[in-house]
Amino acid sequence: RVSTVVFLHAHPDDESIATGGSIARAVHEGHRVVLVMATDGCHGEKPADLGDETLVARRRRETEASARTLGVTDLRWLGYHDSGMTGWPQNDEPGAFIRADVDEAAERLAAILDEVSADVLICYDWHGGYGHPDHIQVHRVGHRAADLRAERGRGVRLLESTMNRTRIARMMSENPGNEGFDPEQPADDGNPFGSTED
């Protein structure tokens, strides 16, 4: 059975990093895939070759190219700004996703789910993988949108993307040149990184 699968991501590039393989597989298996980006990624790292292009324009262009590469033809934007990392002053900027009212953001997402007749919604785990405030907000908004759909008799199967801490630790130990990152250490917000295989 062909399903409509909606992937909700926090920032441009998260679609490739977190679920690129799942997106490509779903497209390959004939499912309709809709990619929804919560933010514009305005506080990401600025590449040296940016020139006159704004970071938002670059990240949007890169996301459009990524979607095409993955086989996605339906890309949506919820319209929020990147909140920056935990504790950054950008957390308090107007329009920052972390400041968005969860119900209002969930209504925006639910409207997309309704429009595309979504069968499956994929968001992040409770910690957003590594504690980024926008990733945690994706979890909240995704769950609330699924609840809204259920309350209206149009349920959606909700799945969560996470990072496999056990596998990442194994890969790091097998490549001793990878120094400076220990997945067993807490993330910036003090919570564990990803999830274990247990």
PLM region spans:
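Metal-dependent de-N-acetylase/amidase catalytic core
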Residues: 1-6, 90-91, 95, 99-198
